[in-house]
Regions:
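N-terminal glutamine amidotransferase
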Residues: 1-125, 130-133, 137
Length: 138
């Protein structure tokens, strides 16, 4: 078996991402928690959940396993919401620090959002230069 065959025959998992929309306000925080718990095998370095309640975003993230980061008290403090996004990280680049945990909170004059992704920006420098030329501030 060649090295390529060995590589292609193995499971290649990276971060786990979970999202939910519930206009009736079903327990979004609990759904995100259980979704991340089920995806935790994809990344055990850090995890986070962000919940949007009528435009107000609450977020909690930290290093560690889902069950360690999200105690009952933390989950209750997040409150209700209609939209939730969760992320558990498997680092392929970057340091193992809480600053690299997701979801990312983005505050903009046109509104706020939480973003979780499963990948790496391989052309971050190029994108930054391009956007700065168009007037975007980083």
């Amino acid at each position: 078996m060649s090295m390529t065959d060995r590589w292609e025959s193995k499971l290649h998992e990276e971060c786990g991402v979970f999202g939910i929309y519930s206009p009736d306000g079903a327990d979004v925080v609990s759904a995100c928690y259980h979704g991340l718990y089920a995806l935790q095998h994809r990344g055990q370095e850090s995890c986070g959940i962000a919940v949007n309640n009528q435009g107000v975003i609450s977020c909690h993230k930290d290093l560690g396993l889902v069950s360690s980061v999200f105690t009952r008290e933390v989950l209750e403090a997040m409150g209700p919401g209609q939209i939730g996004v969760g992320h558990c990280r498997y680092a392929t680049t970057g340091s193992q620090v809480v600053e690299n945990a997701q979801p990312l909170l983005i505050r903009h004059r046109k509104g706020n959002m939480a973003l979780a992704h499963n990948g790496n920006l391989t052309n971050a420098g190029e994108l930054r230069r391009e956007y700065e030329l168009d007037g975007t501030i980083f």
